[in-house]
Amino acid sequence: PSRLVGSEMCIRDSLHLAPAIETLENLIEDGQGSTYDFSFIDADKINYQSYYEYSLTLVKPGGIIAIDNVLWSGQVIDENDSEPATRAIRSFNEKLYQDDRVSISMVPIGDGLTLAYKK
């Protein structure tokens, strides 16, 4: 682990070469639930909801889940856009907005980034 100067924070990093859902399931099975401070989601849009639920299990209260591409080049507001990825992100955004387990802030930078603070 790396150590930040003047801080009690320790940075852990590791590389897992497997499908993301499999890796997240394994982390939970290994007892790592509620041990992470931060999770970043930027993967296949169809599985965003699954990645989010797994991340919510892994991140401890007070932690942050950052979700990339939530504006999807503005396509999420085009109700005529029925592409599977667009529909998946639109549905995910709606569910996230109603999730009382987190407080959220959508940042309109790049392709959109949502920060979800786990209560």
Cite the ranges covered by each PLM segment:
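C-terminal substrate-binding/active-site "lid" region of AdoMet-derived donor-dependent transferases
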Residues: N47-K119
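Distinct, well-ordered alpha-helical segments
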Residues: L24-E29, Y52-S55
